[in-house]
Amino acid sequence: LFFCIDSDDQIIEGTVKKIIETHQGLQDDKFLCGIIAKKLIINRQTSQNLPNLKRSTLHDIYQTGFTGDTSLVFKTSVLREFPFPEIAGEKFVTEGYVYDQIDQKYEFLILNDFLMRCEYQEDGYTTNAASLYLKYPKGWALFYAQYYRFYAKSLRDKIKYMGHYISMCMFAKIPLFKMFNDSPSVIISLISIPAGLKFYKRFKSNASTK
């Protein structure tokens, strides 16, 4: 098993035992990739329960209206199926890129309990997300192009996620020909250029205030 822990996370007492006990229910199920549980955020007054389901993809959990943070435990064999891409000149790709691929094939066993606690730091990943867009735009362009392919159904969503893709290509200084060639849809790319320009200006402004 592989337990995803950030630098500002702390394992709650009894977590390893809970993981081992829950693992008994998933190790022989080839359609389960691991365990999803709750994460306790210390500097928040409330926390949400996960949906009352036995199993789900990570994406579908958030589609139910859940907005909390999660603790993820993966079967190591599943993670090996989905390696992170190597991008010249960049050293970061959001884990969401891999998680979305896993969601296309597997589900998580839901454990409606806390496995870790966290107090978000001012210099942490979540707080400084805007600066990551500027530092690693090629990786983010890959993420948004893939997210578009998997989840953009309505025209509004297509323009939104294509706009994000275009803005990241602009930060990466990717030539127009390559941007359109790698795009999930050339037509939607063309009509999403205004959205791309808007996101480009917003991310640049947000990063400059950090």
Region roles according to the model:
Residues 116-121, 128-153:
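Catalytic core of nucleotide-sugar-dependent glycosyltransferases
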Residues 41, 45-127:
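Conserved nucleotide-sugar donor-binding catalytic segment
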Residues 14, 18-21, 97, 101, ...:
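Alpha-helical elements of Rossmann-like donor-binding domains used by nucleotide-donor carbohydrate transfer enzymes
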Residues 13-47:
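Conserved donor NDP-sugar-binding/catalytic core segment of glycosyltransferases
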Residues 169-210:
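Membrane-interface aromatic/basic loop that binds lipid-linked glycans or pyrophosphate carriers
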Residues 1-10:
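Short beta-strand-to-loop acidic/aromatic patch adjacent to the donor-nucleotide binding site
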